[in-house]
Curated annotation (Swiss-Prot):
Region annotated Transcriptional repression and interaction with NCOR1 and SIN3A, chain positions: 48-117
InterPro entries in UniProt: bHLH_dom, HES_HEY, HLH_DNA-bd_sf, Orange_dom
Role: Transcriptional repressor which binds preferentially to the canonical E box sequence 5'-CACGTG-3'. Downstream effector of Notch signaling required for cardiovascular development. Specifically required for the Notch-induced endocardial epithelial to mesenchymal transition, which is itself criticial for cardiac valve and septum development. May be required in conjunction with HEY2 to specify arterial cell fate or identity. Promotes maintenance of neuronal precursor cells and glial versus neuronal fate specification.
Domain of life of the source: Eukaryota
Complexes and interactors: Self-associates. Interacts with HES1 and HEYL. Interacts with HDAC1, NCOR1 and SIN3A. Interacts with GATA4 and GATA6. Interacts with CCDC89/BOIP.
Tissue specificity note: Expressed in the somitic mesoderm, the central nervous system, the kidney, the heart, nasal epithelium, and limbs.
Swiss-Prot/TrEMBL keywords: Developmental protein, DNA-binding, Notch signaling pathway, Nucleus, Repressor, Transcription, Transcription regulation
Species in which this protein is naturally found: Homo sapiens
SMART domains on file: HLH, ORANGE
Renumbered residue ranges of the record's region Disordered: 1-52, 196-234
Orange domain residues: 122-158
Protein name in UniProt: Hairy/enhancer-of-split related with YRPW motif protein 1
Chain's gene name: HEY1
Biased composition (Polar residues): 28-47, 200-210
Length: 304
């Protein structure tokens, strides 16, 4: 009686593939010697190459995830504001991103491509960071405690300014782009009265702007004690910069830097301009002021 030979079905081949997978997984777990002992050198090199490629792909995937999370942490305002105080987890960054996108969607969808609104948001965050740095400077460097009246008045003034700017930016959010000059009281296409070019012979080459009397009245009311800041009534501005009397004394780099200040967004009413006597080397008070630190905010704090 003949003995029947066993027939190998498809289940047997699947069992062989399972054994090969188990050998490969055992190789990944560290049992390299036992797994490679029954394999040819070609098979073992293929397994090692496949394992190496898998590690490289996994590392690149993790790097892409980490880079994307870093970009989200920088782009989302709430995450950007919080990143200096504590380390953010990946779940927190993703949650803040979802909340920010929901807020933009609730606002009507205009915030996705509104670069001005995004810039105003970052400007508010930057101002808050600078305010915190000022408070740290006053406490650490200047040695002023929290109850010092100078520190209290300065910090409260900056807080009020930040709140007013945030409220103003929120009120004008639906009016489109607001130029920097209109925010601070003058138009960006008109140079500031203190920085307009002057003519040494007293005749102006261009006609006076209709907004010049308005600026002159503002300058006169802001600085009644400084006659050099008042423009002459003849229509030409004359010498409005008391620091230098002619443009020939300025070097070309300084002239270019002064010309670039016409687009500076902040008002010049909060800064005192120096007189020529203060810049002369023979001033009697120069030697007495050498040992004192320069603190312009200490003299201006009374106006807050």
């Amino acid at each position: 009686m003949k003995r029947a030979h066993p027939e190998y079905s498809s289940s047997d081949s699947e069992l062989d593939e399972t054994i090969e997978v188990e050998k490969e997984s055992a190789d990944e777990n560290g049992n390299l010697s036992s797994a490679l002992g029954s394999m040819s050198p070609t098979t073992s090199s293929q397994i090692l190459a496949r394992k190496r490629r898998r590690g490289i792909i996994e590392k690149r995937r993790r790097d892409r995830i980490n880079n994307s999370l870093s970009e989200l942490r920088r782009l989302v305002p709430s995450a950007f504001e919080k990143q200096g105080s504590a380390k953010l987890e990946k779940a927190e960054i993703l949650q803040m991103t979802v909340d920010h996108l929901k807020m933009l969607h609730t606002a009507g969808g205009k915030g996705y491509f509104d670069a001005h609104a995004l810039a105003m948001d970052y400007r508010s965050l930057g101002f808050r960071e600078c305010l915190a740095e000022v408070a740290r400077y006053l406490s650490i460097i200047e040695g002023l405690d929290a109850s010092d009246p100078l520190r209290v008045r300065l910090v409260s003034h900056l807080n009020n300014y930040a709140s007013q700017r945030e409220a103003a930016s929120g009120a004008h959010a639906g009016l489109g782009h607001i130029p920097w000059g209109t925010v601070f009281g003058h138009h960006p296409h008109i140079a500031h009265p203190l920085l307009l070019p002057q003519n040494g012979h007293g005749n102006a080459g261009t006609t006076a702007s209709p907004t010049e009397p308005h600026h002159q009245g503002r300058l006169g009311s802001a600085h009644p004690e400084a006659p050099a800041l008042r423009a002459p009534p003849s229509g030409s501005l004359g010498p409005v910069l008391p620091v230098v009397t002619s443009a020939s004394k300025l070097s070309p780099p300084l002239l270019s830097s002064v010309a670039s200040l016409s687009a500076f967004p902040f008002s010049f009413g909060s800064f005192h301009l120096l007189s020529p006597n203060a810049l002369s080397p023979s001033a009697p008070t120069q030697a007495a002021n050498l040992g004192k630190p320069y603190r312009p905010w200490g003299t201006e704090i009374g106006a807050f």
